[in-house]
Amino acid sequence: AALHRAGYANRAESVAPGDGLRLDDAYITAVVRCAPPANKPKVEERDNCLPYLLRELELLERCRTIVALGSFGWDGALRAARALGAEVPRPKPRFGHLAEADLGRWRLLGCFHPSQQNTFTGKLTVPMIDAAFDRARALTNSVSE
């Protein structure tokens, strides 16, 4: 629903493949491709999956904003950007909700991961998710103007 509210999706929910959901100016991917034990990905799994993320970013020529869900996604995006030649600031930008990092070609935006733990405890709320995708839209619009 958050992608729909921010104008990235043509409908608020999808219940089955082929049900008509369409993303506009958005692409969803993952730093880790497998379902890790206890839903806790390991650094080795992230590193093994890095080539897939690199290839996706290479193919997404129009991509200007990356929303990283969680610190694991943030670190994976920084690694991918560095591997593709981006000048990642030193010290490494710290993850936080609505944290931003300028990676040259991309603007990286942090958002707490929408896990059950984060949403049930209130660490991540609907207004916070909306703020992240609204900010992503603003960042994307500012670089494409």
PLM segments and residue spans:
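A polyanion-binding, active-site-adjacent surface
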Residues: A1-P93, H97-S142
